[in-house]
Amino acid sequence: MECIAIVLLQQFIGISWWWLLVPVLSYKFLIIWGSANIRSNFYTKAHCSAETSEKVIAISFDDGPHPEYTPKVLAVLAEYQAPATFFVIGKNIAGNELIIRRIHENGHILGNHTWSHSFFIDFKGKKAFREELSATCDAVYNIIRKRMNFFRPPYGVTTPHLAAAARAEKNHIIGWNIRSLDTTSDSEMKIFYRIKAEIRPGAVILFHDTSAKTVEVLKQTLNFAKENGFKIVSTGELLKLKAYA
């Protein structure tokens, strides 16, 4: 319909259709960019870092719980006495309830990463999105008896329906400003040097507790933070937000 309207308008006023197409394409690009860039705050506010000169940072993990790697991540965090936030996928909880309990009892924060983490989740409406959030929240509540306030959108993509669902569930949307790319790179060195180059006061680092390389890079990151005077704090403390209802 947009293309037909452009052609008719071009015929009526005699302007090259290329000039009429520019604002349409610009608008489309803006929508795509705003949706895909969680730090843009395009549809909703996302807390991605803290404005501070103090050398404090927060660490977060997506896509767990994983029966093999989440316990290894927890062991590393315990060794360095570092808090973290775990954004869990609801469908991964069954069979891993003890890991969820261990995350909580070790003093870490649990956050919502939807129930399915479907590749097509961003096409869901508000009602379906709320079901994704509430089902995961209920599953975690049944284990730790606390309701999660933190929500991280799958793939970091936001939509109007996601924003409406998060508001309805009274969730804080938590993003990041350092993406480790630990799911796309096979090189532990590249992942670590990417983090090392970007680390700064107030940063929120995104990892995934789903692979052996993340466990090794986490050790390197925590060593680097310690050697360079960075303190690891929880996302709640860093962003001054309440993690549970």
Model features per residue range: what roles?
Residues M1-A58, A75-T85, A197-A245:
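Terminal accessory/targeting
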Residues K72-V73, L98-R102, H161-A165, V217-T221:
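A short acidic, amphipathic alpha-helical/loop segment
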Residues I31-K124, E132-A135, A139, R147-M148, ...:
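Active-site beta->alpha N-cap acidic-glycine motif
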Residues F61, V88-G90, N112-T114, P153-Y155, ...:
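A cross-domain feature marking catalytic cores of carbohydrate-active enzymes
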Residues V157-T159, A163-E198, F230-K242:
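His/Asp/Glu-enriched short active-site or ligand-binding loop at hydrolase and phosphoryl-transfer sites
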Residues P23, P67-L74, S187-I191:
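Short, acidic/polar
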Residues D122-K127, S185-S187:
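Short, solvent-exposed loop/turn segments at secondary-structure boundaries
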Residues L74-V88, H108-I109, G125-V157, A164, ...:
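CE4/NodB-like, metal-dependent polysaccharide N-deacetylase domain
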